[in-house]
């Protein structure tokens, strides 16, 4: 293709946790089930994530994992610079990283409610949560984990281990 793009992915099981919390806090959510129901739902669940991911995977895009970005933002920054053939001053990069952190954005959201652009969410809903990795471990039971493994095998998703 005649474009360059970055595909930023996060562990799909952590995505399910975040998406579930978002849906449960919408005042007009059409989803009313449990977390286990959510990950199995055709519209919201793991299969939908896999289909979306696979629709981008084979395009000429740079793949960046959220987890790698959190663990070594400097390395990922250099990869992005090289991919787009751009140079950004280190101090500007450092400031961008600081101002993109979940903690920084969460503070802004609390202080100014600027990120509260969703009209149909509960009043105290906070869109930016912790941004922590492996939150799914406290949400997925053994049956959910087996379901996820089966879905990953079905769609040949090998970027993350379960």
What is each model feature region?
Residues 7, 51, 71-79, 143, ...:
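Generic recognition of stable, solvent-exposed alpha-helical segments in well-folded globular domains
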Residues 58-84, 107, 135-139:
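Phosphate-binding beta-loop-alpha motif at adenosine-nucleotide cofactor sites
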Residues 6-7, 16, 29-38:
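A contiguous catalytic/ligand-binding core that recognizes phosphate-bearing ligands
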Residues 4-19, 148:
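Conserved phosphate-donor/acceptor-positioning beta-strand/loop module used by diverse small-molecule
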Residues 1-4, 57-61:
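Short glycine-/polar-rich loops that comprise or flank the Walker A/P-loop
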Residues 20-23, 27, 36-43, 53-57, ...:
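PAPS-dependent sulfotransferases, especially Golgi type II membrane carbohydrate sulfotransferases
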Residues 16, 49-53:
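Rossmann-fold NAD(P)H-dependent dehydrogenase/reductase core
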